[in-house]
Amino acid sequence: MEELKFLEEQQVASELIKRVEEFRSQYEVVPETAGRIVKPSIPFYGKDILEMAIAGLLKGENLLLTGPKATGKNILAENLAYIFNRPAYNVSFHVNTNSGDLIGTDTFVDNEVKLRKGTIYQCAEYGGFGILDEINMAKNDAVSVLHATLDYRRSIDVPGYDKIDLHPAARFIGTMNYGYAGTKELNEALVSRFLVIDMPAQTEESLEFIFRRMFPNIKENARTQFIGVFLDLQLKATNSEISTKPLDLRG
């Protein structure tokens, strides 16, 4: 199975891989959401983090990926959705995000008021993986609507409509950076509903993997130099000698 092959390559525990296969067999994807299952641009590299995240998701936990810039938080979230063969629902949080954006709002359809389902509602309904990007940028009153969704109740109560229970395969993966403009500490009540994974900084080994995957024809000397430059920038940013702005793998 292509989606799980790279787990075997990284020597992820065979028991975890077996349980992922069982999860995939148990929860089939409905045709209308199949287009949301997208192969990531690159596999996530890091056996320990993968095992921790997969074990948490199999136990029904929601994940909160924290850590400095350029540690692969979004790549990991996308990989997990792909590994579990679940449709991915991305929500990019910002200061103006409100509960209507997440759960849904009223709209007119054929002269009738109906609910336009939000991203979180659809994720809950179809058993997707909700990727909550930069969750610490939203106001607390906006994300508070997620409390019942993320804890043992696993439900969404839509005012004026009905209560829906989450699909048993639905999971939520939040990502957050510290120190970005507009970010803040998350409410303790919200954090307690996640399994928090602190993402480690890039290493020479992980950067070697990324460069070999993304640029297979690059000259070895050039690859070594690029890796060295990034590690130097990362060290200086960690020691607050420079800003974190130049520390980026996207460019």
Predicted regions and their residues:
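C-terminal helical "lid" subdomain and adjoining coupling/linker elements of P-loop NTPases
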Residues: 237-251
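Conserved core positions of repeat-based scaffolds
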Residues: 228-236
